[in-house]
């Protein structure tokens, strides 16, 4: 294991840590005062990266939580191994996440997940529920009816997907199309950068998309939530063009430990444009007594 700080941006540190053959990039915000609160781990969806949590992480740190947001392997600025080195399956991602958490000596924590790759975070939480203090979900698939939208599904098509995933503007079209609002160029430049630096970024996105196995993941998640007891909050962008919020509402209404926070105008990536509003509710949820 090898760990080093690359750069400090405001109160957010950008770091790299080597876990076996994998190199994880992650952002971290330390609380202004030391507390005994367990950390919060933020997991992004596709084709995003940890930058998507740039505003929410300082919000929770201000209230005493250490916030950590990694770039998934194959995404953002983490390593992008070839498929014979890393399978890009949910199981491979869960194993890799376990290694990342162990390297940072994180045992008990709260988990925040978003988007289609967020399903891996949900699968991890359901398999390690004794380690999860609180779970927070933002616009992630939650029922067997959830499907990968065509905009993403086409990334996994032979030949066509190989061309599409090499286009850096794919990031602009997906993040802005999914969120419904313009994302400032200063952030789009960072989101695009991995695709401009190496063709490995596109190949990793293609492999991730092909191997999501959403149907199997949804079956596991639906079964797992049947007896889920940890405090949970669902923050939902009601205008999501790709996911139906009814499944999220139904899940929340079926469990007394799950709260539902609607944001009617927000879409698939609500944290991009509603981070202040979501952050306030998130802090209130985290501070609430069980």
Q: What are the roles of these predicted feature ranges?
A:
Residues 4-23:
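N-terminal cap/lid segment of alpha/beta-hydrolase-fold proteins
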Residues 20, 27-30, 62, 69-113, ...:
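Active-site loop/oxyanion-hole signature of alpha/beta-hydrolase fold enzymes
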Residues 29-77:
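Conserved HGGG/HGGXW glycine-rich cap/lid loop of the alpha/beta-hydrolase fold
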Residues 114-123:
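Glycine-rich nucleophile elbow surrounding the catalytic serine of serine-hydrolase chemistry
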Residues 126, 133-163:
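Flexible "cap/lid" loop of the alpha/beta hydrolase fold
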Residues 148, 165-226:
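Conserved alpha/beta-hydrolase catalytic His-Asp/Glu region
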Residues 201-253, 262:
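Conserved serine/cysteine hydrolase catalytic core
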Residues 258-290:
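Catalytic active-site module of serine/aspartate enzymes centered on a nucleophile-bearing elbow/loop
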């Amino acid at each position: 294991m090898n760990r080093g700080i690359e750069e400090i941006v405001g109160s957010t540190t950008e770091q790299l840590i080597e876990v076996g053959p994998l190199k994880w990039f992650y952002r971290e915000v330390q609380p202004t005062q030391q507390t005994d609160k367990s950390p919060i781990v933020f997991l992004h969806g596709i084709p995003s990266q940890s930058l998507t949590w740039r505003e929410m992480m300082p919000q929770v740190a201000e209230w005493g939580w250490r916030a950590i947001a990694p770039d998934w392997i194959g995404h953002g600025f983490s390593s992008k191994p070839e498929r014979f080195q890393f399978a890009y399956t949910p199981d491979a991602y869960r194993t890799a996440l376990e290694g990342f958490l162990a390297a940072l000596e994180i045992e008990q924590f709260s988990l925040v997940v978003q988007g289609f790759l967020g399903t891996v975070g949900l699968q991890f939480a359901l398999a390690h529920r004794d380690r999860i203090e609180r779970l927070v979900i933002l616009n992630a698939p939650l029922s067997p009816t959830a499907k990968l939208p065509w905009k993403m599904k086409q990334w996994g098509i032979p030949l066509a997907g190989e061309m599409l995933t090499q286009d850096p503007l794919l990031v602009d079209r997906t993040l802005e199309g999914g969120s419904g609002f313009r994302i400032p160029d200063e952030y789009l430049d960072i989101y695009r950068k991995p695709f401009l630096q190496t063709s490995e970024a596109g190949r990793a996105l293609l492999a991730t998309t092909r191997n999501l196995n959403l149907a199997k993941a949804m079956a596991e998640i639906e079964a797992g939530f049947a007896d889920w007891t940890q405090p949970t909050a669902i923050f939902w962008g009601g205008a999501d063009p790709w996911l139906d919020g009814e499944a999220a509402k139904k899940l929340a209404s079926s469990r007394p430990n799950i709260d539902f926070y609607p944001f009617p105008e927000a879409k698939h990536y609500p944290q991009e444009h509603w981070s202040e509003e979501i952050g306030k509710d998130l802090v209130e949820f985290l501070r609430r007594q069980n």
